[in-house]
């Protein structure tokens, strides 16, 4: 296995090099931009190289005992007491604090414009939010400006429409959906982490999910809250060996955002680990049965994306219409993730030269910081996280950050669930935990302020 791991590592490095060399020879970015591209690729490569041996180790070793197996009878009573009420209460209080903070920031800058609840829609209905509410109200159309809404996936608007029958309005429905999804995400994420770490560490990991700089988007009428709920619940059921439930939830994640289909990566890796364990144990009947079950189930995962393509076809007569709209209306397509680092840096330099500090600190600096810092954290985490989580992050990062006109790196990366797990590993010591938590909260407050004040935060 060590020899195989070395071969795979060499193949990965050669593949990354094969991508970068022709890019470097033909790119029109600046020399400094090219350096940023190389740095991004290097961090990505280090993360992959560290994850490969862990993957092969997982394929040839049995699953370690869960933390609860190491506890005595008295401690087990505490271990089994799920802190769901405390988790949900903390999430609900944090939502109220976010709404209050957004209102205070706007009031301090723009003067009193009404109470917190009266100005809620004005402050939070920004960026892509009106598009999702428009789809919820009118579905997809082929005329006027709403025709461009075809680039947005349908599951979140469908959920908004469903809850609108309860709330009586689409905005209130979206806010309710996001609060419920945030609470559900916190509970499922805790349960997922508690499968392999002590209670307090699992709670700390949940905390880091909600203190990430762009985590306030979990409260905004956007897909993030629903998407992360589907992702972490899918992973929870996967780890509990309920593969069908995991793949169905992954399919719904793919019906919410295109990146949902990437959940096939950890599902496949965890499946391979389980199958290898059954094979080593000589349980051939179980091995064959589990192999058939997992192979059949993983084909469910892309059904969400296929459902979105079918929506494109029924509305426009073209299953790939969204690609055309993205390309022609937003100049958006899928590119190389390390090129994003290059052009974002060059755009940042141009913003400095033109004196556009609003664009510099609202868009380019957050994008670059989110991309590089997340890779740096995952380089540390790759030595400790499950390899399925690390490879999912790498696939998610390459896909999400590889946009040819990236606007939302902090928001996209806030939805990458392996990142807070790596942060919790990084902040093992209490002092580090306090410093990191406060730093992330302060950045989130600043980023929230830029969002509610109409800055280039998307």
Question: Where in this protein do the model-derived segments appear?
Answer:
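Short acidic/glycine- and proline-prone juxtamembrane loop motifs at membrane-interface regions
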Residues: 219-226, 409
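Loop-to-helix entry region of an early transmembrane alpha helix in multi-pass inner-membrane enzymes
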Residues: 147-154, 158, 166-187, 217, ...
């Amino acid at each position: 296995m060590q020899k195989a791991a070395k071969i795979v590592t060499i193949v990965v490095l050669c593949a990354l090099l094969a991508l970068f060399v022709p890019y470097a020879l033909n790119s029109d970015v600046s020399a400094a931009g090219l350096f940023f591209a190389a740095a991004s690729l290097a961090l990505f490569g280090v993360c992959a190289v560290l994850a490969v041996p862990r993957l092969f180790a997982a394929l040839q070793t049995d699953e370690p005992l869960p933390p609860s197996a190491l506890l005595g009878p008295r401690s087990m009573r505490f271990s089994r007491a799920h802190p769901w009420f405390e988790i949900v209460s903390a999430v609900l209080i944090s939502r109220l604090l976010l709404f209050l903070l957004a209102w205070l920031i706007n009031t301090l800058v723009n003067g009193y414009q009404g109470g917190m609840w009266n100005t809620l829609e004005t402050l939070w209905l920004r960026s892509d939010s009106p598009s999702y509410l428009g789809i919820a109200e009118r579905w997809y159309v082929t005329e006027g400006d709403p025709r461009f809404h075809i680039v947005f996936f349908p599951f979140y608007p469908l959920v908004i429409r469903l809850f609108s029958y309860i709330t009586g309005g689409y905005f209130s429905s979206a806010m309710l959906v996001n609060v419920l999804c945030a609470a559900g995400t916190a509970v499922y994420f805790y349960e997922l982490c508690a499968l392999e770490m002590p209670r307090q560490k699992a709670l700390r990991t949940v905390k880091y999910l909600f203190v990430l700089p762009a985590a306030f988007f979990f409260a905004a009428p956007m897909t993030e809250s629903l998407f992360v709920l589907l992702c972490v619940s899918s992973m929870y059921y996967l780890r509990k060996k309920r593969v069908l439930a995991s793949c169905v939830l992954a399919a719904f994640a793919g019906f919410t955002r295109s990146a949902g289909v990437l959940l096939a990566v950890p599902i496949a890796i965890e499946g391979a680990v389980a199958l290898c364990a059954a094979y080593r144990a000589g349980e051939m009947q179980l091995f064959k049965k589990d192999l058939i079950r997992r192979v059949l189930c993983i084909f469910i995962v892309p059904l969400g994306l296929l459902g979105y393509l079918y929506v494109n076809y029924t509305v426009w007569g073209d299953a790939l219409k969204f690609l055309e709209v993205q390309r022609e209306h937003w100049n958006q397509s899928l590119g190389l993730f390390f090129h994003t680092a290059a052009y974002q840096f060059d755009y940042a330099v141009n913003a400095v030269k033109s004196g556009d500090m609003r664009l510099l600190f609202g868009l380019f600096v957050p994008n670059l910081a989110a991309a590089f810092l997340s890779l740096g954290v995952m380089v540390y985490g790759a030595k400790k996280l499950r390899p399925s989580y690390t490879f999912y992050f790498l696939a998610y990062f390459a896909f999400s950050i590889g946009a040819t006109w990236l606007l939302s790196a902090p928001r996209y990366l806030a939805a990458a669930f392996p990142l807070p797990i790596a942060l919790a590993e990084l902040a093992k010591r209490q002092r580090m935990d306090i410093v990191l938590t406060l730093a992330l909260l302060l950045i989130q407050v600043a980023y929230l302020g830029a969002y509610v004040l109409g800055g280039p935060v998307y």
